[in-house]
């Protein structure tokens, strides 16, 4: 409850309250009536208040502090629910500020309450940290300690909710609250809003103090008290509760105030779903029966004597007039078949700036061509507010819906997404709330469309966004979509421009209506740089390996695949271009992928011509269209026999010590490569010990560079780590990558690439990298990769220092070596001592005979391995009659010792 109101706000309150405003939505057709009944809500207290007001309470309000356990609350909760009402608890942490809470000082208490409320099971509306836009509570932003900020409040509120969710207390609904006025430095209505994922309801507290207070309070109408806060909260797509309100008797007509208050709520505050009176004689007499006139007005306003059934606890939106039906994702993918992208249109900065604007006749032409799906990329950034509440421009949302309706009306499976909204990756944690609000509005606008409309969360995330953040984003947005679109199919993908390499690494949410997506533009030099030709056996083998890789992921995870983009620039070799479209589309459709070819409507551009459909002449490139729809038209392909799997080698005993690969004391044996304007050079300079290799590199936006050392012996299976000394020599502290390349499966170029990122600084550092710390390279894999997903240490081709970004710099490296165990990891075994009694005699000979004759039982596999090591006397990795002969000769003293 608000304790005081500054006089400086009073004049502003009166003036602003006189202004009209337009409310949003219409949620209060069944306004819920609630109250703090003036004391803790026992059965008798609830009954007495209901008799007084002449109506059952829908909501019963309770105040507790953070020294109160749920065991104390439970009898009151039982009384509330036995009455058929909802319990709303205002939870006041008098002992803590928001910094304490976010830092975990109250975690034990919060956890205990979460567990107890979960066990209770009934729905509870919980209102923690209320009226924080004031200056009278220890958790408030304006409090005199100045320790609370918007940021610490948000973190504290979210921390509380996260603990409840972690303990499974999903029966608790979260109520965010503001005071009717902002009081104190740094306060605002929405600056401390925790975000839609953490709030189920918003609420406002406000009082008409009349002329009762010494600080100069004056009589205010309901609108003068509540209009400003309501306008702020109405911008959030959450139902609103008037959680505390009341009027004084002194200074005006309380009965009239009550009547006008409820009239205002029902006519102008359409997002308000509940009004909860504060019934107590406290700072002044707030009770509904402070006078007979007030009580009569209150009973009339709430409809005393009317029948009001038990309220539905959780607000739900108006059900759609024609809800989309649930469709199995595999069935949807089969329905989608071959489709197209409406590229460079709604995902341009502004429609028409990259290509011809969308026209309805396009969809007639797509239909005639045979397409079954249309992907409509959409960029929302330039049409969305950059500050809270991040509202999408209505005209643009209407335009997107118009284009979607054109597509759906022709029977197309239609996909809309977030496309080129690259701002999310620049500061994921700072921008995710805006992205969530965008998707909340998309989901709300399109919730009534047919099941043939699919949502794709994000097109081609890349750059600074991590795989973990992409997983988090997919999870967050999916939860938002599911609130209004419970069965709509949603498409998810991985990073690095929706690469197949990252698709197989994404964390798949537990949801039955998902499709995975990937894009394919390989080889990039051909598809985007129009260099060389395409169509060799090896070219096609590479596609088959990649698509089989994706299909295997699909089968393992029982999730269908949408091949969302593929294309070649028009300036590429024409015959090769047609072959590429033909083979790629065949390979995808044969594996059950749905497809959408990339078509951006651009003709004649040297760096952007990927059009198949001419939007002006309404004609298609029929040769490519034929390649897309007719299998095997151009290339002749005979799949290679499946390669013989590499034999599984037995575990090896780790080497002990170190092996120098290059200390740079002789001839420099490193090569280099670069392209797209990037450059690299190497030379011998002074190193950490003796000589080292200096690498000087210049990066560019699309450039690449690297230095490479080809290995004479590529079997590292007995080694545990690789180590080198490195430092930056020009003051730069740029990230670079150290890469291990396997041997190619076809003998051409490299095999699978494995990388580890490092950031050298100006002092020498020894970097030791366990081989288990290398990760499969995501931005590129060569055609010769085996796609095993395992670093094959017995099949290493080369090592590289290479680019990680477009920066320039210089570093020196020295003493590259392999690291083994620090000591012999196997216990000492005496060869020939098969019963391990530290003697070699006839007993051991008898045991060896029995083992060879398979009549010796050794127990566990570990015991057998130990026996075999002692019995393998000629060290040929097998135990046979040759070992028996050696042992006989030793016992007969024909040889003086067993060879080791």
From Swiss-Prot:
Region (Disordered): 303-326
All copies of domain Dockerin, residue ranges: 827-900
Keyword annotations from UniProtKB, A to Z: Carbohydrate metabolism, Cellulose degradation, Glycosidase, Hydrolase, Polysaccharide degradation, Signal
Active site (record annotation): 131 (proton donor), 244 (nucleophile), 460 (proton donor), 565 (nucleophile)
Residue spans of biased composition, Low complexity class: 306-324
Domain of life: Bacteria
Pfam family, one: Dockerin_1
Gene Ontology CC annotation, any one: cell surface
GO MF terms, alphabetically ordered: beta-glucosidase activity; cellulase activity
Entries under InterPro entries matching the protein: CBM11, Dockerin_1_rpt, Dockerin_dom, Dockerin_dom_sf, Galactose-bd-like_sf, GH26_dom, Glyco_hydro_5, Glyco_hydro_5_CS
BP terms from Gene Ontology: cellulose catabolic process
Domain CBM11: 655-900
Region feature Catalytic, mapped onto this chain: 300-630
GH26 domain mapped to chain residues: 45-298
E.C. number(s) listed in UniProt: 3.2.1.4
Catalytic activity: Endohydrolysis of (1->4)-beta-D-glucosidic linkages in cellulose, lichenin and cereal beta-D-glucans
Signal peptide: 1-44
Task of the protein: This enzyme catalyzes the endohydrolysis of 1,4-beta-glucosidic linkages in cellulose, lichenin and cereal beta-D-glucans.
Annotated family: In the N-terminal section; belongs to the glycosyl hydrolase 5 (cellulase A) family.
Protein known as: Endoglucanase H
Gene designation per UniProt: celH
């Amino acid at each position: 409850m608000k304790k005081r109101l500054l006089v400086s706000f009073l004049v502003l309150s009166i003036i602003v309250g006189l202004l009209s405003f337009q409310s949003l939505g219409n949620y209060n057709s069944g306004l819920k009536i609630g109250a703090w009944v003036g004391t803790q809500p026992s059965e008798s207290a609830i009954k007495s208040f209901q008799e007084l007001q002449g109506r059952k309470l829908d909501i019963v309000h309770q105040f507790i502090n953070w020294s109160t356990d749920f065991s104390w609350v439970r009898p009151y909760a039982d009384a509330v629910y036995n009455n058929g009402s909802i319990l709303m608890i205002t939870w006041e942490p008098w002992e803590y500020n928001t910094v304490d809470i976010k830092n975990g000082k109250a975690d034990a208490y919060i956890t205990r309450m979460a567990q107890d409320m979960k066990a209770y099971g009934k729905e509870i509306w919980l209102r923690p940290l209320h009226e924080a836009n004031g200056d009278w509570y220890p958790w408030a932003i304006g409090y005199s300690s100045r320790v609370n900020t918007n940021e610490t409040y948000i973190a504290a509120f979210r921390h509380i909710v996260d603990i409840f969710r972690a303990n499974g207390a999903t029966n608790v609904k979260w109520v965010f609250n503001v005071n009717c006025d902002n009081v104190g430095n740094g306060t605002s209505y929405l600056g401390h809003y925790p975000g839609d994922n953490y709030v189920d309801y918003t609420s406002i507290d406000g009082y008409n103090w009349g002329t009762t207070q010494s600080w100069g309070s004056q009589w205010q109408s309901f609108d003068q008290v509540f209009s400003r806060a309501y306008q702020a909260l109405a911008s959030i797509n959450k139902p609103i509760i008037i959680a505390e309100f009341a009027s004084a008797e002194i200074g005006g007509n309380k009965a009239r105030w009550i009547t006008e208050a409820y009239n205002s709520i029902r006519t102008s505050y359409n997002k308000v779903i509940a009004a909860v009176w504060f019934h107590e004689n406290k700072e002044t007499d707030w009770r509904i029966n402070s006078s007979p006139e007030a009580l009569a007005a209150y009973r009339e306003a709430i409809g005393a004597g009317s029948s009001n059934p038990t309220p539905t606890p959780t607000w739900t939106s108006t059900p759609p007039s024609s809800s989309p039906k649930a469709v199995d994702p595999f069935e949807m993918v089969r329905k989608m078949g071959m489709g197209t992208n409406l590229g460079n249109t709604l995902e341009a900065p502004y429609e028409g700036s990259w290509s011809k604007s969308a026209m309805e006749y396009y969809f007639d032409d797509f239909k005639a061509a045979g397409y079954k799906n249309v992907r409509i990329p959409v960029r929302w950034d330039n049409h969305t507010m950059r500050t809270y509440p991040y509202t999408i421009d209505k005209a643009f949302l209407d335009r997107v819906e118009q284009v979607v309706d054109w597509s759906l009306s022709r029977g197309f499976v239609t996909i809309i997404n977030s496309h080129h909204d690259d701002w999310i990756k620049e500061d994921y944690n700072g921008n995710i709330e805006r992205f969530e609000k965008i998707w909340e509005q998309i989901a709300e606008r399109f919730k009534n469309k047919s099941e043939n409309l699919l949502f794709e969360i994000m097109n081609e995330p890349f750059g600074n966004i991590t795989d973990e953040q992409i997983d988090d984003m997919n999870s967050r947005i999916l939860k938002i979509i599911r609130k209004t679109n419970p069965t709509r199919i949603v498409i998810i993908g991985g990073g690095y421009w929706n690469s197949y390499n990252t698709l197989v690494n994404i964390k798949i949410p537990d949801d039955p209506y998902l499709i995975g997506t990937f894009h394919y533009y390989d080889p990039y030099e051909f598809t985007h740089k129009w260099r060389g030709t395409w169509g060799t056996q090896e070219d096609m083998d590479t596609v088959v390996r990649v698509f089989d890789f994706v299909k295997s992921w699909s089968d393992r995870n029982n999730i269908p695949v949408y091949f969302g983009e593929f294309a070649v620039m028009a300036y590429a070799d024409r015959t090769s271009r047609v072959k590429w479209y033909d083979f790629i589309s065949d390979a995808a459709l044969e594996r059950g992928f749905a497809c959408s070819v990339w078509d951006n409507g651009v003709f004649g551009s040297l760096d952007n011509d990927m059009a198949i459909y001419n939007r002006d002449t309404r004609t298609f490139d029929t040769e490519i269209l034929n390649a897309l729809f007719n299998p095997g038209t151009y290339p002749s392909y005979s799949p290679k026999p499946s390669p013989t799997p590499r034999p599984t080698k037995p575990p090896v005993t780790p080497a002990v010590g170190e092996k120098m690969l290059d200390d740079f004391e002789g001839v420099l044996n490193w090569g280099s490569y670069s392209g797209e304007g990037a450059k690299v050079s190497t030379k011998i300079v002074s190193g950490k010990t003796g000589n080292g290799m200096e690498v000087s590199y210049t990066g560019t936006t699309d450039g690449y560079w690297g230095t490479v050392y080809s290995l004479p012996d590529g079997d590292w299976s007995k080694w545990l780590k690789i180590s080198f000394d490195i430092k930056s020599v020009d003051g730069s502290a740029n990230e670079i990558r150290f890469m291990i390349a396997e041997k190619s499966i076809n003998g051409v170029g490299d095999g699978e690439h494995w990388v580890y990122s490092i950031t050298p600084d100006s002092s020498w550092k020894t970097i030791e990298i366990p081989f288990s710390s290398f990760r499969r390279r995501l931005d590129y894999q060569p055609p010769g990769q085996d796609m095993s997903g395992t670093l094959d240490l017995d099949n290493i081709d080369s090592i590289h220092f290479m680019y990680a970004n477009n920066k320039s710099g210089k570093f020196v490296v020295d003493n590259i070596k392999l690291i083994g165990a620090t000591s012999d990891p196997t216990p000492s075994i005496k060869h020939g001592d098969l019963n391990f009694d530290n003697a070699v005699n006839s007993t051991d000979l008898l045991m060896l005979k029995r083992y060879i004759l398979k009549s010796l039982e050794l127990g566990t596999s570990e015991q057998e391995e130990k026996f075999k090591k002692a019995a393998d006397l000629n060290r040929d990795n097998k135990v046979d009659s040759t070992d028996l002969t050696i042992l006989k000769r030793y016992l007969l003293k024909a040889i003086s010792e067993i060879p080791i």
